[in-house]
Amino acid sequence: MLTCKQYELLLFIHNHMKEIGVPPSFDEMKIALELTSKSGIHRLITALEERGFIRRLPNRARAVEVVRLPEKITFNLSSARKISPNVIENNRRKISKNSKNLNNFDIEDKKNVTVPIMGRIAAGVPVSAIQQQTNTLCLPADMISLGEHYALEVKDDSMIEAGILDKDTIIVRRQNTATPGEIIIALIDKEEATLKRYRRNGASIALEAANPHYETRIYRPERIEIQGKLIGLIRKY
């Protein structure tokens, strides 16, 4: 079992190795995890090494390598042109303290959960913009309901009157149905993803912005795939 910080560090080291070819320095790790001292990084490194996720190599600078990633939080993104993250699943049934199945979460004391940030969402972005995991987000477990979840970074003001601002991070439960009035991630023509309020307009689907500068857009049902429902957001000040 990993804590959120341990998993964040493991993923940072893994991604740094893939992109740069060498492990990050302790200073880079400290900055990435927003820690104030290297001692916190040393403790996380030691914990990851004890659990068999990384290995320290003697007599070498930046001598850390990733041995393995936790199986339950390895993300396998579909090559299909839609949002299809194989994300962490949370099932809020009661679990015995001795249970080895933690509902596909790596949880510390069942208080925090880690979900993937799957890119950025705007009024209409190419679906490829939200298919790639860019980071992870640590959340209180009671913020998450049944189902699979992921996060997206908002990059426009089309939903501002619904309280969703540019640079907010939204939490989405993956589902393919919605009730009129709910805010959803919609895939249009398998090409374009957008965050809008879901409405019915006769036999058609209306995607409604929460900003008078954006028009409501009407589509035939076969052009729209619902990819998830908004369940919460996080804002940094």
Curated annotation (Swiss-Prot):
Question: Per its UniProt entry, which superkingdom is the organism in?
Answer: Bacteria
Q: Which Pfam families match?
A: LexA_DNA_bind, Peptidase_S24
Q: Which Gene3D superfamilies match?
A: Umud Fragment, subunit A (2.10.109.10), Winged helix-like DNA-binding domain superfamily/Winged helix DNA-binding domain (1.10.10.10)
**Residue ranges of the TM segments:** none
UniProt keyword list: Autocatalytic cleavage, DNA damage, DNA repair, DNA replication, DNA-binding, Hydrolase, Repressor, SOS response, Transcription, Transcription regulation
User: Which residues are annotated as active site?
Assistant: 158, 196
Q: Which reaction does it catalyse?
A: Hydrolysis of Ala-|-Gly bond in repressor LexA
Which residue positions does UniProt flag as site: Cleavage?
123-124
InterPro entries per the record? LexA, LexA-like, LexA/Signal_pep-like_sf, LexA_DNA-bd_dom, LexA_repressor, Peptidase_S24_LexA, Peptidase_S24_S26A/B/C, WH-like_DNA-bd_sf
Give the annotated DNA-binding region, as residue ranges.
Answer: 26-46
Q: Which GO terms describe its biological process?
A: DNA repair; DNA replication; negative regulation of DNA-templated transcription; proteolysis; SOS response
User: Molecular function (GO) terms listed?
Assistant: DNA binding; serine-type endopeptidase activity
- What EC designation does it have? 3.4.21.88
Family per UniProt? Answer: Belongs to the peptidase S24 family.
Per its database record, what is this protein's job?
Represses a number of genes involved in the response to DNA damage (SOS response), including recA and lexA. In the presence of single-stranded DNA, RecA interacts with LexA causing an autocatalytic cleavage which disrupts the DNA-binding part of LexA, leading to derepression of the SOS regulon and eventually DNA repair.
- What is known about its subunit structure? Homodimer.
What name is this protein filed under?
LexA repressor
Upper taxonomic lineage: Bacteria, Pseudomonadati, Pseudomonadota, Alphaproteobacteria, Hyphomicrobiales
| Designated gene of the protein | lexA
